[in-house]
Amino acid sequence: MVLMIVSGRSGSGKSVALRALEDMGFYCVDNLPVVLLPQLANTLAERNSSAAVSIDVRNMPESPEVFEYAMTQLPDSFSPQLLFLDADRNTLIRRYSDTRRLHPLSSKNLSLESAIDEESDLLEPLRSRADLIIDTSEMSVHELAEMLRTRLLGKRERELTMVFESFGFKHGIPIDADYVFDVRFLPNPHWDPKLRPMTGLDKPVASFLDRHTEVHNFIYQTRSYLEQWLPMLETNNRSYLTVAIGCTGGKHRSVYVAEQLADYFRSRGKNVQSRHRTLEKRKQ
């Protein structure tokens, strides 16, 4: 397991790095006092979970020996790594001007420039110990997150999770949907008394819908649309793509179509989840 310690000058991108690490599966803690690192590591060792902890000038120990001692108290199952983010002085000044935030050392009645310089001196012990130093001066938020994934996971893109969910329009459109497709125009199994009690997960309903050309055409055109834009969506720094398929009640057509799309992209090696809102409500 990895204990990633994220440090760096204020404004260099520590919050961005912590969010990216969280997306990679790290248990993240912002501004944990150094003396509590062993306690956190021991707790997470029981869960077999890697962790990322940010340390900045606000929770730096007064003596470097405190940090070194904390490192010696980590359980053997953890491999500590220190990531230090930095940026040039002018970039940090510009970022603070853009966000209009106060520097952590501004409470000492220092000017922004003086606060940045003093912070550099205070963080030098960590910088000199860093396993990886990243200069974010010319990086966007997305580029920093991408670099971390490349360095830590050995691949450029994070794995996008495609979520196909069915719903009923009479219950409302899901607010988490990135795309919403309406299948109320497709033949409706509801009007067949034998199929009405069933759902789109049942074979008789699937056979009914499978007999109709318009159902095949809709599924083909929808998956083709998603395939065309999926490469760009995968590089757009997102973790999930939620595709909602809606019919009137969310029981037959939308369930079947959502499952067909999920099976198709799953067979193409994508990370896929499927859920059925109306069916989940019926189980409650």
Swiss-Prot record:
It holds the Pfam family PapZ_C. InterPro entries: P-loop_NTPase (IPR027417), RapZ-like (IPR005337), RapZ-like_N (IPR053930), RapZ_C (IPR053931). GO terms for molecular function: ATP binding; GTP binding; RNA binding. GTP binds at residues 56-59. ATP binds at residues 8-15. Keywords: ATP-binding, GTP-binding, Nucleotide-binding, RNA-binding. Residues 266-284 are annotated as: RNA-binding. Homotrimer. Modulates the synthesis of GlmS, by affecting the processing and stability of the regulatory small RNA GlmZ. When glucosamine-6-phosphate (GlcN6P) concentrations are high in the cell, RapZ binds GlmZ and targets it to cleavage by RNase E. Consequently, GlmZ is inactivated and unable to activate GlmS synthesis. Under low GlcN6P concentrations, RapZ is sequestered and inactivated by an other regulatory small RNA, GlmY, preventing GlmZ degradation and leading to synthesis of GlmS. Belongs to the RapZ-like family. RapZ subfamily. HAMAP family: RapZ_like (MF_00636). This is RNase adapter protein RapZ.
